[in-house]
């Protein structure tokens, strides 16, 4: 009987063991290929966002300075003034590595950072903070889970230090992913229990396996590889060879005029046709009761700030506006939006994060927005005027003064004068 079982299952077990050994002992390092790295940097796929190998390879390239651009879906709004296009056209000293997806916010970004901590150390980054992230209940667990994987989990468990940030991250992970792998270890962290030697040995073993698995399968990744032509290359020939903001503005303004011709809301024609037009009447005053002042996202943002402080990262934060015509039509309250911006800025500035490009009042400028909430055309140009000088003249991170009160529910639900928060 045992012999028959071995004849059936033995080959499967041997094959599984060989695959495990192949992956476990596969080299974690990948050879640099600038062309491939440029393509993965602008792929804006779920894979390029949440997987380790492609972003680590690019961010560790000694011959090209790729800079993490953290955000959500704004990176997908390509045109002639998009930061990836301008950096390539004018051969700047850096290239953006675009990290974001629709529905992603600070919690996903934090866990993604755990995969590339050595590549963040003492570096500059760009971080877009969209006030729309700060909804009452935060974002849906399904959205979080879509951008989370086992490598992020073991990277987090390996690097956590048992501090308040680690405890909070573990608690949020259980909320967003109740059936997460290694749940017992995550629960220990959330409960402030110390991990045992056996726990740490298992984490280290699985972390090495996940890292090598990412390297092994990353070499076969082609998803998004051919998007470079659509996202970047097609715009290069439309821009003037000699850099000039005025000349670039003339080009992208003409493009914007052509592509916002079918609506009175200043939105790109395609977006208006596919996302707004059919429901236009229903959308009137649909956001009049929205508030972004009370949200767990404020605590999630503190996770990111804590990581930046630990890694001595020098970030510039971008706060985008809402399309003013859309804001008025949908009934979104301007005073609430600006109060949200002030709350975000207070959390940043009071802890020493003072590099902020605040465009929150520019949503009424012509051709500033691509759609309802995303920058485009002249908005990207304004973005570039703030970001390019920052990245082209690197400086070390300042000294930060973290305040753990920003992890509290009191702060997450506070809607008063920020200067009076105790």
Task: Give residue spans per PLM region.
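Extended hydrophobic/aromatic segments used for targeting, binding, or gating
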Residues: 88, 293-299, 304-367
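Hydrophobic membrane-insertion alpha-helices, especially the h-region
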Residues: 4-26
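Loop/turn elements at helix/coil->beta-strand transitions in domains of secreted/extracellular proteins
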Residues: 64-66, 94, 121-124, 310-315, ...
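Short loop/turn segments at strand-loop or loop-helix junctions that form parts
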Residues: 71-72, 128-132, 270-279, 318-323, ...
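Membrane/wall-proximal cationic-aromatic binding patches
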Residues: 30-94, 111-113
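C-terminal regions of proteins
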Residues: 99-101, 336, 342-422
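Secreted/periplasmic serine-hydrolase-like ester/acetyl group-modifying domain
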Residues: 35-36, 156-300, 403-422
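Membrane-embedded segments
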Residues: 75-165
């Amino acid at each position: 009987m045992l012999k028959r079982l071995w004849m059936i299952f033995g080959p499967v077990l041997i094959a599984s063991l060989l695959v495990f050994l192949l992956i476990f002992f596969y080299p974690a390092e990948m050879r640099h290929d600038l062309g491939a790295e440029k393509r993965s940097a602008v792929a804006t796929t779920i894979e390029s966002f949440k997987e380790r190998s492609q972003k680590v390879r690019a961010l560790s390239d000694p011959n090209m300075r790729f800079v993490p651009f953290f955000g959500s879906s704004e990176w997908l709004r390509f045109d002639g003034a998009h930061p990836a296009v301008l950096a390539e056209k004018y051969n700047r000293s850096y290239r953006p590595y675009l990290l974001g997806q629709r529905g992603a916010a600070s919690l996903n970004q934090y866990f993604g950072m755990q995969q590339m901590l050595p590549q963040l150390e003492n570096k500059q980054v760009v971080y877009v903070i969209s006030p729309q992230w700060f909804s009452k209940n935060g974002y849906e667990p399904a959205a979080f889970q879509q951008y989370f994987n086992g490598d992020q989990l073991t990277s987090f468990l390996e690097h956590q230090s048992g501090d308040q940030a680690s405890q909070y991250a573990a608690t949020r992970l259980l909320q967003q992913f109740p059936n997460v792998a290694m749940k017992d270890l995550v629960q220990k962290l959330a409960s402030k229990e110390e991990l045992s030697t056996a726990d740490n040995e298992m984490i280290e073993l699985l972390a090495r396996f996940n890292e090598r698995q990412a390297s092994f399968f990353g070499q076969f990744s082609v998803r998004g590889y051919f998007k470079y032509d659509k996202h970047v290359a097609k715009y290069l020939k439309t821009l003037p060879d000699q850099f000039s903001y005025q000349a670039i503005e003339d080009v992208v303004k003409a493009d914007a005029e052509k592509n916002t011709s079918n609506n009175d809301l200043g939105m790109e024609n395609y977006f208006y046709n596919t996302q707004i037009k059919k429901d236009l009447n229903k959308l009137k005053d649909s956001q009049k009761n929205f508030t972004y002042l009370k949200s767990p996202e404020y605590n999630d943002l503190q996770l990111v700030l804590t990581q930046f402080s630990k890694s001595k990262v020098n970030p510039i934060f971008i706060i985008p506006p809402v399309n003013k015509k859309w804001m008025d039509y949908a009934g979104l309250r301007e005073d609430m939006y600006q109060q949200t911006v002030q709350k975000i800025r207070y959390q940043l500035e009071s802890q020493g994060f003072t590099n902020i490009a605040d465009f929150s009042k520019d949503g009424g400028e012509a051709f500033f927005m691509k759609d309802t909430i995303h920058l485009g055309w002249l908005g990207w140009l304004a973005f570039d005027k703030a970001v390019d000088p920052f990245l082209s003249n690197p400086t070390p991170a300042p000294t930060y003064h973290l305040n753990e009160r920003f992890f509290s529910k009191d702060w997450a639900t506070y809607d008063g004068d920020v200067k009076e928060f105790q």
